[in-house]
Regions:
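Structural motif corresponding to the intra-repeat A-B loop/turn of tetratricopeptide repeats
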Residues: 42, 71, 75, 104, ...
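Generic helix N-cap/helix-start motif at coil->alpha-helix transitions
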Residues: 24-32, 43-44, 56-63, 75-76, ...
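Alpha-helical adaptor scaffolds
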Residues: 68-70, 85-86, 98-103, 273-288, ...
Length: 657
């Protein structure tokens, strides 16, 4: 019943979105595609075949063929799979099926065919990598957890192929007790308790921890730490205490640091003490604890992983300690050190220490890039950007060539039919090797189809030749302008936020329930509707464009009134007003860029960077002026500063997109 209702909804959406450019037949063919898709999802081969019979020559024939063979791949003869791969060579569905087949081949140890297909599969797939390593190990290659750290230290439950590799290494006595506990620590740090218990199953009984003590470490870590076992010289007992500390430090880093300093450090080996100081400092930095740098100082540099190094830099930024910023970035591995964020902050650290020539050299590495730190670096060099000019407009011949591209046809058709996940993957595959001109032609094709997210994605990828009108489109411009004026909001900021929220997909829905152009949550929508006097509001209409923009801009106005700053309001729109307030410093004003870089949630940190950078370009396109990003970021006042009182009717916090 659910699948039938889903099919009907998808069909209705497809008919509503039908456009003259689309490669689509009559409604009956739309119904047949969705019916075939239902058959595939339900595992009903007869149903799939019945609908597929009506679709001979359809643009989505490769997908119909894929659905048919994928349903029975375990039992499909090798010649038939090879025939599919040859028939659909250089398509997304061929790559998809080859990945599926490699896992089947690995599962059945058909290494001859696996080795034949592996070079033809370019994707970075963890399970396929594991089967490749298992093949080599079974042929006598020396394979250990150190050789397969990319798998062994993955912070999730291992897929079947990786579990098989781990078991083989265990059977060959290539896994040590230290290897097992190293993986368990990674899993505990990431809350993967079930996977940690699975990994502990690799240990011999005499090396295994007490199950009750392990359960307490996961659920009641303070209890374990308050009643330290006497026999800490035993590895299994000591490791469980370390695990308990990891859980406790995540919840309360300040209390954990006091406990470590007062008595726990004296009971543990020096290497474990350094490891725990590094972790408690990391968690303290994420909570903006003022003592985080002191805790970092008690950990050996060698004990810090990439995340811990990044948060040491962030803690130093909040403390204004430019020497530690510079020294810590110097400790980063080369790939991390060359990321645009650390390139910019290294330049700032050099400037703060009077090394202006050196700082300019670092800014020049990323200046001209159109992202958050590229803009800031350009501004540090004194480059005041003029409103961006599109350097390339695709010709009609180029757009027509994009229209004839079979992969793009399939992508847009899948999206039109409501099969967005499949359509997006088809699109990404199709444009992956496009040069700038082809990317912009594909972007223009998607723009004409009003598939705004794909248009933006293609235009965003250009390297030398750009089209900012495609990269920063203005659908529904009049609606956004009207409501930005109604609520006295900067329309460039609103557009920058919507570009990040939904990519202008009017019927977008998140897994959390956020809906529409401005990704309004259900409870937030009801709250704002009541606040602004939107009468007879029904949530089923939340994706209607006028309604959604009314609610979204109304909420943005309420948040801005409470927090008084676009950076704070942007963070609040993504993660809630209370968090945005809490992330300010307790006593010191912070640069807006430092506040943004030190947001604890990586999703929100990235979100605010993109919203604020987007706003710069939308101001240029809509208002014909470039307000520097640094000016938009401004300064964030400390928590103790006088601000508007929190209303008696606080904004919703419990349903975040």
């Amino acid at each position: 019943m659910v699948c039938r209702e889903l099919r009907n909804l998808l069909l209705a959406a497809a008919l509503a979105l039908a456009a003259p450019w689309a490669v689509a037949g009559p409604a009956s063919s739309d119904e047949a595609v969705l019916g075939a898709y239902d058959g595939y999802r339900e595992g009903d081969a007869l149903k799939l075949a019945r609908y597929a019979k009506r679709l001979e020559g359809h643009v989505l024939t490769p997908w119909l063929d894929y659905w048919r063979i994928a349903m029975r791949l375990e039992d499909t003869p090798t010649p038939e799979v090879r025939a599919f791969l040859d028939q659909h060579a250089n398509t997304y569905v061929a790559e998809l099926l080859r990945g599926d087949w490699l896992k089947v081949l690995g599962k059945h140890a058909d290494w001859e065919e696996f080795e034949r297909q592996l070079p033809l599969y370019p994707r970075d797939d963890l399970e396929v990598h594991c089967y490749a390593a298992l093949m080599e190990a079974q042929r006598g290659e020396e394979t250990s957890p150190a050789d397969t750290a990319w798998m062994w230290l993955d912070p999730h439950e291992l897929p079947d192929g990786c579990a098989s590799l781990a078991q083989f290494m265990l059977d060959q006595e290539r896994v040590t007790v230290t290897d097992v506990w190293r993986r368990v620590r990674v899993l505990f740090r990431n809350g993967q308790i079930t996977a940690a218990k699975t990994t502990l199953g690799y240990l011999e009984k005499e090396d295994s921890p007490d199950e009750r003590l392990l359960a307490d470490a996961a659920r009641q870590p303070k209890r374990v730490l308050d009643r330290l076992p006497r026999n800490l010289e035993r590895r299994a007992v000591r490791e469980v205490v370390v695990l308990a500390f990891l859980r406790y430090a995540r919840a309360d880093p300040e209390a954990a640091a006091k406990l470590l300093e007062s008595h726990l450090a004296a009971r543990l080996p020096e290497s474990d003490v350094h490891y725990l100081w590094a972790y408690v400092a990391y968690e303290g930095a994420r909570e903006h604890q003022p003592d985080a740098l002191k805790w970092y100082a008690r950990a050996a540099h060698e004990a810090l992983d990439e995340d811990e190094l990044a948060w040491k830099v962030r803690a130093a930024l909040r403390a204004g300690n430019w020497r530690v910023v510079r020294d810590t970035i110097d400790l980063m591995p080369p790939m991390q050190r060359h990321e645009s964020a650390w390139t910019y902050w290294y330049g700032r650290a050099l400037a703060a220490q009077g090394e202006e020539t050196g700082s300019r050299a670092y800014y020049l590495r990323i200046a001209g890039q159109t992202d958050f730190y590229g803009l800031l670096a350009s501004e540090e060099l004194g480059y005041v950007e003029a409103p961006p000019q599109s350097t390339y407009v695709p010709t009609e011949a180029e757009v027509d060539a994009a229209r004839q591209n079979a992969g793009l046809q399939r992508a847009l058709e899948l999206i039109r039919l409501g099969l967005r996940t499949e359509g997006v993957k088809e699109w990404l595959f199709s444009v992956r090797y496009f040069d700038d001109a082809k990317l912009l032609a594909a972007s223009e094709l998607a723009r004409r189809a009003e598939v705004w997210d794909r248009s933006i994605q293609a235009a965003d990828r250009t390297v030398r030749t750009h089209n900012f009108a495609l990269r920063y489109p203005l659908p529904f411009r009049d609606v956004f302008t009207e409501y930005a004026k109604t609520y006295n909001l900067d329309v460039a900021w609103v557009l920058g936020l919507v570009r990040q929220e939904s990519r202008f997909i009017s019927d977008a829905r998140s897994n959390a329930g956020a809906a529409g152009l401005m990704q309004v949550m259900p409870r937030t929508a009801r709250f704002v509707a009541r606040k602004i006097g939107l009468r007879n509001y029904m949530h089923k209409g939340v994706t209607e464009i006028q309604t959604n923009v009314t609610l979204g801009t109304g909420y943005l106005r309420l948040v801005l009134d409470q927090l008084g700053h676009q950076v704070l309001a942007s963070a609040a729109y993504n993660a809630g007003p209370s968090r945005a307030r809490r992330w300010r410093d307790a006593t010191r004003p912070l640069e807006g860029a430092i506040y943004t870089e030190t947001i604890p949630f990586s999703e929100t940190r990235d979100y605010v960077k993109k919203v604020m950078a987007n706003s710069v370009f939308y101001a240029a396109l809509v208002q014909k002026q470039m307000t520097p990003l640094k000016a938009r970021l401004g300064v964030i006042a400390p928590r103790g500063t006088a601000e508007p009182a929190e209303p008696a009717d606080p904004l919703p916090e419990d349903e975040l997109p």
